[in-house]
Amino acid sequence: MLSNTGNFLLLLSILFTFFIIYQSFTCLKKNNDVIFKSIYKISLLQSTTILICFFTLVGAFMVSDFSLINVYQNSHTLKPIFYKISGTWGNHEGSLLLWVIILTIFSFLFLITNKNHPKNYRINTLIIQNILILGFLFFILFNSNPFSSISLFPKKGLD
């Protein structure tokens, strides 16, 4: 169940990132304030979706959901809860997801805090940031998915 939720949230965040890039290019061409305000809302949704995705992975580590390959390889039932939580980002897949969280939060904070800069500067910066975010999201989804599941899993974990 957590693998489906995590994968759905990853796909949803990819959709939001595409939408932000598309709206940013449209805003550059049309110079429309309504489109620019919608970018704020979609950027907030993008950040929230990635955060929920990460906390889904944290939850999988906390309850020792060994149907996820990532949890199976990096956790054990006897580990203290602190080590289970830190095991979320202590591996390749989790650290990439944490990196995407940092990128999306800084992208959203850039939109909020830099209102005194020219609009074209903000939009161009947002386009570059979201192209990077999109690249990381595709890499996570297709190459280093923390929500990859296995059908036969042990009861105690590897680590």
Locations of regions flagged by a protein language model:
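Polytopic transmembrane helical bundles with strong interfacial aromatic enrichment
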Residues: 1-159
